[in-house]
Amino acid sequence: MTLVYPRRQRQLESLVRKLGLPITAPIKWELLDLALTHPTVSESANYEQLEFVGDAVVRLAAAVMLWETYPDCPVGDFAAIRSVLVSDRILAQLAREYGLELHLLVAGSATSDKIGQESRLADAFEAVLGALYLSTSNLELIRPWLDHHFRQLAAEIRLDPARLNYKAALQEWTQAQFKVLPEYRVVEINQANRTQERFAAEVWLHGNKLGEGKGRSIKAAEQAAAKVAFLAITPPEEIANQ
Protein backbone atom coordinates (compact mmCIF):
# COMPACT_ATOMS: atom_id res chain seq x y z
CA MET A 1 0.00 0.00 0.00
CA THR A 2 1.42 3.38 -1.04
CA LEU A 3 0.55 6.76 0.42
CA VAL A 4 -1.91 9.24 -1.03
CA TYR A 5 0.79 11.88 -1.33
CA PRO A 6 3.37 10.97 -4.01
CA ARG A 7 5.98 13.42 -2.67
CA ARG A 8 5.87 11.89 0.81
CA GLN A 9 5.98 8.41 -0.69
CA ARG A 10 9.15 9.31 -2.58
CA GLN A 11 10.72 10.65 0.62
CA LEU A 12 10.01 7.43 2.47
CA GLU A 13 11.27 5.32 -0.42
CA SER A 14 14.50 7.33 -0.35
CA LEU A 15 14.94 6.50 3.33
CA VAL A 16 14.20 2.82 2.74
CA ARG A 17 16.90 2.71 0.07
CA LYS A 18 19.37 4.29 2.50
CA LEU A 19 18.59 1.43 4.86
CA GLY A 20 19.58 -0.96 2.09
CA LEU A 21 16.06 -2.33 1.70
CA PRO A 22 14.21 -2.70 -1.61
CA ILE A 23 11.11 -0.55 -1.97
CA THR A 24 9.28 -3.76 -2.87
CA ALA A 25 9.80 -4.99 0.71
CA PRO A 26 6.55 -5.64 2.63
CA ILE A 27 6.62 -2.27 4.37
CA LYS A 28 3.47 -0.72 5.76
CA TRP A 29 4.10 2.75 4.39
CA GLU A 30 1.39 4.39 6.46
CA LEU A 31 3.20 3.22 9.60
CA LEU A 32 6.55 4.47 8.35
CA ASP A 33 4.94 7.83 7.61
CA LEU A 34 3.53 7.91 11.13
CA ALA A 35 6.93 6.97 12.57
CA LEU A 36 8.34 10.15 11.08
CA THR A 37 5.60 12.48 12.32
CA HIS A 38 6.41 14.43 15.49
CA PRO A 39 3.66 15.10 18.07
CA THR A 40 3.91 18.83 17.33
CA VAL A 41 2.44 18.10 13.90
CA SER A 42 -0.51 16.07 15.17
CA GLU A 43 -1.64 15.30 18.70
CA SER A 44 -3.15 11.96 17.66
CA ALA A 45 -1.43 10.84 14.44
CA ASN A 46 2.22 10.84 15.51
CA TYR A 47 5.10 8.52 16.33
CA GLU A 48 4.52 8.07 20.07
CA GLN A 49 2.88 4.63 19.96
CA LEU A 50 5.38 3.34 17.40
CA GLU A 51 8.20 4.67 19.57
CA PHE A 52 6.82 2.58 22.44
CA VAL A 53 6.96 -0.53 20.23
CA GLY A 54 10.35 0.42 18.83
CA ASP A 55 11.83 0.75 22.31
CA ALA A 56 11.22 -2.97 22.82
CA VAL A 57 12.29 -3.83 19.26
CA VAL A 58 15.69 -2.14 19.47
CA ARG A 59 16.42 -3.92 22.74
CA LEU A 60 15.43 -7.25 21.18
CA ALA A 61 17.57 -6.62 18.10
CA ALA A 62 20.57 -5.73 20.27
CA ALA A 63 20.04 -8.77 22.51
CA VAL A 64 19.83 -11.22 19.61
CA MET A 65 22.92 -9.75 17.94
CA LEU A 66 24.92 -9.98 21.18
CA TRP A 67 23.80 -13.54 21.83
CA GLU A 68 24.79 -14.66 18.33
CA THR A 69 28.08 -12.75 18.23
CA TYR A 70 29.34 -13.42 21.77
CA PRO A 71 27.87 -16.76 22.89
CA ASP A 72 30.34 -17.01 25.80
CA CYS A 73 29.91 -13.45 27.09
CA PRO A 74 28.61 -13.12 30.68
CA VAL A 75 24.96 -12.12 30.65
CA GLY A 76 25.70 -9.16 32.92
CA ASP A 77 28.01 -7.77 30.25
CA PHE A 78 25.24 -8.28 27.70
CA ALA A 79 22.99 -5.97 29.71
CA ALA A 80 25.72 -3.37 30.20
CA ILE A 81 26.66 -3.36 26.51
CA ARG A 82 23.04 -3.22 25.43
CA SER A 83 22.44 -0.21 27.66
CA VAL A 84 25.02 1.66 25.59
CA LEU A 85 23.72 0.40 22.24
CA VAL A 86 20.14 1.53 22.91
CA SER A 87 21.04 4.87 24.52
CA ASP A 88 19.62 8.07 23.06
CA ARG A 89 23.11 9.17 22.06
CA ILE A 90 23.74 6.09 19.92
CA LEU A 91 20.24 5.98 18.43
CA ALA A 92 20.39 9.68 17.53
CA GLN A 93 23.80 9.07 15.97
CA LEU A 94 22.35 6.29 13.81
CA ALA A 95 19.35 8.45 12.94
CA ARG A 96 21.69 11.16 11.64
CA GLU A 97 23.69 8.61 9.68
CA TYR A 98 20.55 7.66 7.77
CA GLY A 99 19.30 11.23 7.46
CA LEU A 100 16.11 10.77 9.46
CA GLU A 101 15.97 14.48 10.24
CA LEU A 102 15.40 15.13 6.52
CA HIS A 103 12.19 13.08 6.60
CA LEU A 104 10.91 13.87 10.10
CA LEU A 105 7.82 16.10 10.06
CA VAL A 106 8.21 18.61 12.91
CA ALA A 107 6.29 21.82 13.61
CA GLY A 108 8.25 25.06 13.64
CA SER A 109 8.03 25.43 17.40
CA ALA A 110 10.09 22.26 17.90
CA THR A 111 12.63 22.80 15.13
CA SER A 112 14.14 25.69 17.09
CA ASP A 113 14.65 23.45 20.13
CA LYS A 114 18.24 22.38 19.56
CA ILE A 115 18.53 20.88 23.04
CA GLY A 116 15.73 18.41 22.34
CA GLN A 117 17.02 17.41 18.92
CA GLU A 118 18.92 14.33 20.09
CA SER A 119 15.88 13.04 21.96
CA ARG A 120 13.62 13.67 18.94
CA LEU A 121 15.94 11.78 16.62
CA ALA A 122 16.31 8.86 19.03
CA ASP A 123 12.53 8.69 19.46
CA ALA A 124 11.97 8.80 15.70
CA PHE A 125 14.58 6.09 15.15
CA GLU A 126 12.79 3.82 17.63
CA ALA A 127 9.49 4.61 15.92
CA VAL A 128 10.92 3.62 12.53
CA LEU A 129 12.04 0.31 14.02
CA GLY A 130 8.55 -0.12 15.44
CA ALA A 131 6.99 0.51 12.03
CA LEU A 132 9.32 -1.94 10.30
CA TYR A 133 8.73 -4.61 12.93
CA LEU A 134 4.94 -4.25 12.73
CA SER A 135 5.14 -4.51 8.94
CA THR A 136 6.28 -8.14 9.18
CA SER A 137 5.94 -9.03 12.89
CA ASN A 138 9.64 -9.93 12.96
CA LEU A 139 13.11 -8.42 12.54
CA GLU A 140 13.62 -9.23 8.85
CA LEU A 141 13.43 -5.56 7.79
CA ILE A 142 15.70 -4.45 10.64
CA ARG A 143 18.60 -6.81 11.21
CA PRO A 144 20.04 -6.67 7.66
CA TRP A 145 21.07 -3.03 8.15
CA LEU A 146 21.15 -2.55 11.95
CA ASP A 147 23.22 -5.58 12.95
CA HIS A 148 26.50 -4.35 11.52
CA HIS A 149 26.20 -1.04 13.40
CA PHE A 150 25.50 -2.78 16.68
CA ARG A 151 28.20 -5.38 16.05
CA GLN A 152 30.84 -2.71 15.43
CA LEU A 153 29.78 -0.66 18.44
CA ALA A 154 29.71 -3.73 20.69
CA ALA A 155 33.24 -4.66 19.62
CA GLU A 156 34.45 -1.14 20.48
CA ILE A 157 32.74 -1.27 23.88
CA ARG A 158 34.26 -4.65 24.71
CA LEU A 159 37.73 -3.27 23.91
CA ASP A 160 37.12 -0.39 26.32
CA PRO A 161 35.48 -1.78 29.49
CA ALA A 162 35.06 1.75 30.84
CA ARG A 163 32.23 2.15 28.33
CA LEU A 164 30.23 -0.72 29.81
CA ASN A 165 27.21 1.01 31.29
CA TYR A 166 26.34 -0.87 34.46
CA LYS A 167 24.81 2.30 35.91
CA ALA A 168 22.19 2.36 33.17
CA ALA A 169 21.59 -1.38 33.47
CA LEU A 170 21.11 -1.10 37.24
CA GLN A 171 18.84 1.92 36.88
CA GLU A 172 16.74 0.06 34.34
CA TRP A 173 16.37 -2.87 36.73
CA THR A 174 15.46 -0.77 39.79
CA GLN A 175 12.91 1.22 37.81
CA ALA A 176 11.33 -1.96 36.47
CA GLN A 177 11.22 -3.60 39.90
CA PHE A 178 10.56 -0.71 42.27
CA LYS A 179 9.88 2.43 40.16
CA VAL A 180 12.79 4.22 41.87
CA LEU A 181 16.38 5.16 41.06
CA PRO A 182 19.39 3.91 43.01
CA GLU A 183 21.30 6.43 45.13
CA TYR A 184 25.08 6.88 44.79
CA ARG A 185 27.26 8.13 47.65
CA VAL A 186 30.79 9.12 46.69
CA VAL A 187 33.74 10.19 48.84
CA GLU A 188 37.28 11.18 47.92
CA ILE A 189 39.74 8.74 49.47
CA ASN A 190 43.09 9.53 47.83
CA GLN A 191 43.56 13.20 47.07
CA ALA A 192 47.35 13.08 47.15
CA ASN A 193 47.91 10.60 44.30
CA ARG A 194 45.55 11.26 41.42
CA THR A 195 46.97 8.44 39.33
CA GLN A 196 45.43 5.86 41.65
CA GLU A 197 41.85 5.14 42.62
CA ARG A 198 40.80 8.47 44.01
CA PHE A 199 37.10 7.98 44.75
CA ALA A 200 35.01 5.38 46.53
CA ALA A 201 31.33 4.98 45.70
CA GLU A 202 28.45 3.13 47.29
CA VAL A 203 25.10 2.46 45.66
CA TRP A 204 22.01 2.29 47.86
CA LEU A 205 18.39 1.28 47.36
CA HIS A 206 15.62 1.45 49.95
CA GLY A 207 18.16 1.97 52.73
CA ASN A 208 20.26 -1.04 51.72
CA LYS A 209 23.78 -0.87 50.33
CA LEU A 210 23.86 -2.88 47.11
CA GLY A 211 27.50 -2.50 46.18
CA GLU A 212 30.65 -0.43 46.41
CA GLY A 213 33.56 0.34 44.12
CA LYS A 214 36.55 2.59 43.53
CA GLY A 215 37.81 4.56 40.56
CA ARG A 216 40.04 7.38 39.39
CA SER A 217 36.96 9.53 38.75
CA ILE A 218 33.54 9.82 40.34
CA LYS A 219 32.00 8.30 37.23
CA ALA A 220 34.39 5.34 37.26
CA ALA A 221 33.75 4.70 40.95
CA GLU A 222 29.99 4.78 40.43
CA GLN A 223 30.27 2.38 37.51
CA ALA A 224 32.37 0.01 39.63
CA ALA A 225 29.79 0.09 42.42
CA ALA A 226 26.94 -0.36 39.95
CA LYS A 227 28.62 -3.42 38.44
CA VAL A 228 28.99 -5.08 41.84
CA ALA A 229 25.37 -4.31 42.68
CA PHE A 230 23.91 -5.31 39.33
CA LEU A 231 25.67 -8.66 39.16
CA ALA A 232 24.78 -9.41 42.78
CA ILE A 233 21.06 -8.70 42.67
CA THR A 234 19.95 -9.78 39.19
CA PRO A 235 19.79 -13.49 38.33
CA PRO A 236 21.01 -14.27 34.78
CA GLU A 237 17.55 -15.28 33.55
CA GLU A 238 16.11 -11.99 34.81
CA ILE A 239 18.78 -9.96 33.02
CA ALA A 240 18.10 -11.83 29.79
CA ASN A 241 14.39 -11.06 30.01
CA GLN A 242 14.78 -7.34 30.62
Swiss-Prot record:
Homodimer. The gene is rnc2. This is Ribonuclease 3 2. Digests double-stranded RNA. Involved in the processing of primary rRNA transcript to yield the immediate precursors to the large and small rRNAs (23S and 16S). Processes some mRNAs, and tRNAs when they are encoded in the rRNA operon. Processes pre-crRNA and tracrRNA of type II CRISPR loci if present in the organism. It catalyses: Endonucleolytic cleavage to 5'-phosphomonoester. Belongs to the ribonuclease III family. Mg(2+) binds at E51, D123, E126. The keyword Transcription does not apply. Keywords: Cytoplasm, Endonuclease, Hydrolase, Magnesium, Metal-binding, mRNA processing, Nuclease, RNA-binding, rRNA processing, rRNA-binding, tRNA processing. PANTHER family: RIBONUCLEASE 3, RIBONUCLEASE III. The active site is at D55, E126.
